[in-house]
């Protein structure tokens, strides 16, 4: 979904691989520091106050299911990038947003700003399969 948004808007897309299912403890793209630097508006290694260079970041996933992925991103980024700086909460709240195609209203993460449609998996336990998922082996 993020690549589609990027192509339609002409805004650069950066991949951030986070996988919390199938026994994986979580993994971050090797170059995750760009996110903090872009959101903070870092110039020459220094945080510029009121910097017009601070970028707005949209984190996109196909579904906010349990909320674990978005929560992990939030906690990992906060712990590794300027956690003691009081600017953190202003930057995170003002420059970083979350978007998803499907919002599970029963999710533990309440910070999704944009979604296409919603469902409540606590009321109806459905399993969604998106066209880009590996759902089996391809036979010629």
Residues of each region from the PLM?
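Hydrophobic alpha-helical segments in the ANL/AMP-binding
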Residues: 1-7
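Generic structural signal for beta-strand residues in well-ordered domains
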Residues: 6, 50, 89-91
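Short, glycine/charge-rich flexible loops or terminal/linker lids adjacent to PRPP-binding catalytic cores
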Residues: 8-58, 65-75
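PRPP-dependent phosphoribosyltransferase catalytic core
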Residues: 75-140
């Amino acid at each position: 979904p993020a690549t589609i948004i990027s192509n339609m808007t002409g805004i650069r897309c950066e991949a951030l691989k986070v996988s919390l299912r199938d026994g994986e403890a979580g993994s971050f793209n090797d170059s995750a520091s760009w996110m903090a630097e872009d959101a903070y508006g870092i110039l020459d290694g220094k945080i510029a106050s009121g910097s017009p260079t601070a970028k707005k970041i949209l984190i996109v996933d196909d579904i906010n299911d349990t909320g674990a992925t978005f929560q992990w991103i939030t906690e990992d980024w906060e712990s590794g990038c300027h956690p003691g700086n009081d600017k953190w909460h202003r930057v995170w709240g003002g420059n970083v947003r979350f978007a998803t195609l499907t919002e599970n209203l029963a999710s533990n993460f309440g910070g999704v700003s944009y979604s296409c449609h919603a469902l409540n998996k606590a009321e109806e336990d459905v399993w969604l399969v998106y066209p880009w998922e590996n759902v089996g082996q391809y036979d010629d």
